[in-house]
């Protein structure tokens, strides 16, 4: 039992080294070919592709809404359980491992990779949409009422709070533990080693990693495309700049160029630096909105949002007997499928930067800290938007007309609107750069067979691919092409839900083995156990 996780497989042993690259055979080759075929097909038949993928996405959501909701609840409970159990003392990388990044830089990278851009896009638009019945109201509450306002904030927190971060935490902890503590490659397949042992390095593992690569690059490319549209829309709204395809392509070129520079510089010189800049700029904007908006009333807004979140988290996470099917299928199940499809990317990136933390520290940081930050952010921005709607102030008073402009419409009614809106555009772009460069590092690691130090040309290849895909889809197929690829990424959420549930079982098996046979709480040396506990 002590040698249960020993394997003769060596990281990179299946790799092909040519053209300055270090490519896993066959994951790199198959992923590249399939991505190319999907993009070409979508460019040639954008409307047909969108219709087909929308159909598969709709089928997944309509028939398996219960599975997404149940799985989301399981992930949250599983993470909370790990905080309480003795396995929480296990340190990622072994008892002597030290964190590679300061707490502040670590938090900044977690947040920027996880959902920073989403908070810019939806922090005003989503509560406003729920309050005005743009696409259903949570739990069927009457729109444009005080109760509807409270529930709009609570439901928004539900979609951006514990559940999505629990999804990321399961993947991230599984990858980090099996890589740093068991010596397995840092790829999705390694999480299944407890079940299938060395078969993980065969075609079963190849398929899992290929799907993870495709979900990641499709998700990143579509987000980059939609982000370019939002940034272009913001520039047009503020400065009258044409928001057409030329502006959008220029934004993509700029974002991709900076992302390439960042991935060349690596985690320390690129991703960490941009994430710290992100956190600083976001904090400035947040403090401004609080100061000129709610002021000291922000504490009431936070209590209002937190209270609604706590009161409604169970009803919102349950599908039985609900009459708001339009809402929970259109919003909640969609979000859960999207978070799950993004989990290979975000989870692997979090694993990359989390060595040296204990399991307990890891779960608290990944699950609770972002939830608290999101609570403050949503209370400030979402609360300000709803307050303007209730007071009949500005364009938001007429409801949500253009989701991408809701943030700018809210800022337009505050002092120094031009400056703060310009800062918001910069934040949108920098958040996209951090998503692109961290995503490129993740895809690079998977397609290099789990290597953390793949050659620079390989990093450049994937960062360039993301920009080319986004630009080509915008230029050739517009919103239909982007929507098709987004629907394809979300469709991956259904099979990956089962993958994540299996990960929970495998992770617990691995942690239990580590506690008993490696840390010595069963038969091994007591000193390591004491060291682990004292350092937790």
What function would you assign to each model-found segment?
Residues 1-146, 264, 287, 504-511, ...:
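N-terminal alpha-helical transmembrane segments of multi-pass membrane transport
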Residues 3-6, 30-44, 69-77, 239-265, ...:
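Transmembrane alpha-helical segments of multi-pass small-molecule transport proteins
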Residues 8-18, 51-57, 85-103, 128-154, ...:
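Flexible loop linkers connecting adjacent transmembrane helices
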Residues 15-20, 45-60, 79-100, 152-159, ...:
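Membrane-water interface regions at transmembrane-helix termini and the short interhelical loops
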Residues 17-26, 61-65, 95-113, 153-162, ...:
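Transmembrane-helix boundary/entry motifs in multi-pass membrane transporters
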Residues 19-43, 76-79, 115-119, 159-229, ...:
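Helix-loop-helix module between adjacent transmembrane segments
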Residues 34, 67-84, 282-293, 373-383, ...:
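Hydrophobic alpha-helical segments of multi-pass membrane transport proteins
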Residues 200-357, 364, 369-421, 429, ...:
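Membrane-embedded translocation segments of transport machinery
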């Amino acid at each position: 039992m002590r040698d249960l996780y020993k394997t003769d497989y060596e990281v990179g042993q299946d790799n092909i080294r040519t053209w300055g690259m270090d490519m896993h055979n066959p994951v790199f080759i198959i992923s590249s070919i399939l991505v190319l075929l999907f993009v070409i097909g979508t460019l040639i038949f954008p409307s047909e592709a969108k219709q087909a993928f929308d159909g598969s996405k709709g089928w997944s959501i309509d028939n398996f809404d219960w599975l997404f909701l149940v799985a989301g609840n399981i992930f949250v409970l599983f993470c909370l359980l790990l905080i309480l159990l003795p396995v929480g003392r296990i340190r990622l990388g072994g008892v002597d491992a030290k964190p590679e990044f300061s707490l502040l830089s670590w938090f900044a990278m977690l947040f920027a990779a996880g959902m920073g851009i989403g908070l810019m896009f939806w922090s005003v638009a989503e509560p406003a949409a729920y309050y005005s019945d743009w696409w259903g109201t949570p739990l069927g509450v009457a729109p444009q009422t005080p109760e509807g306002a409270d529930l709009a904030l609570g439901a928004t927190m539900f979609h951006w709070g514990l559940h999505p971060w629990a999804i990321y935490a399961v993947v991230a902890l599984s990858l980090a533990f099996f890589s740093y503590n068991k010596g397995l490659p840092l790829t999705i397949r390694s999480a299944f080693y407890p079940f299938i042992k060395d078969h993980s390095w065969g075609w079963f593992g190849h398929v899992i990693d290929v799907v993870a690569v495709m979900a990641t690059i499709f998700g990143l490319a579509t987000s980059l495309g939609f982000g370019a549209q939002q940034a272009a829309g913001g520039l047009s709204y503020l400065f009258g700049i044409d928001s057409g395809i030329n502006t959008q392509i220029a934004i993509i070129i700029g974002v991709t160029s900076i992302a390439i520079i960042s991935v060349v510089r690596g985690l320390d010189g690129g991703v960490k630096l941009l994430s710290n800049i992100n956190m600083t700029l976001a904090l400035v904007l947040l403090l401004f909105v609080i100061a000129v908006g709610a002021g000291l009333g922000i504490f009431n807004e936070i209590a209002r949002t937190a209270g609604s979140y706590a009161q409604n988290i169970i009803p919102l996470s349950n599908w039985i007997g609900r009459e708001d099917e339009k809402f929970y299928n259109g919003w909640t199940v969609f979000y859960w499928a999207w978070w799950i499809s993004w989990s290979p990317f975000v989870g692997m990136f979090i694993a990359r930067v989390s060595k040296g933390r204990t399991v307990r520290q890891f779960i608290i940081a990944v699950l609770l800290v972002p939830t608290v930050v999101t609570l403050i952010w949503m209370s400030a921005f979402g609360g300000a938007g709803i307050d303007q709607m209730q007071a009949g102030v500005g364009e938001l008073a007429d409801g949500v007309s253009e989701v991408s402009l809701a943030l700018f419409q809210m800022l337009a009614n505050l002092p120094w609107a031009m400056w703060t809106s310009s800062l918001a555009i910069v934040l949108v772009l920098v958040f996209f750069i951090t998503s692109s460069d961290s995503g490129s590092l993740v895809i690079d690691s998977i397609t290099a067979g789990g290597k953390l130090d793949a050659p620079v040309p390989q990093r450049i290849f994937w960062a360039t691919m993301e920009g080319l895909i986004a630009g080509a889809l915008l230029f050739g197929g517009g919103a239909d092409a982007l929507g098709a690829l987004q629907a394809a990424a979300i469709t991956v959420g259904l099979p990956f839900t089962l993958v994540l549930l299996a990960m929970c079982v495998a992770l617990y098996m691995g942690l239990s083995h580590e506690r008993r046979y490696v840390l010595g709480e069963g038969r091994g040396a007591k000193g390591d156990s004491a060291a682990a506990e004292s350092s937790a």
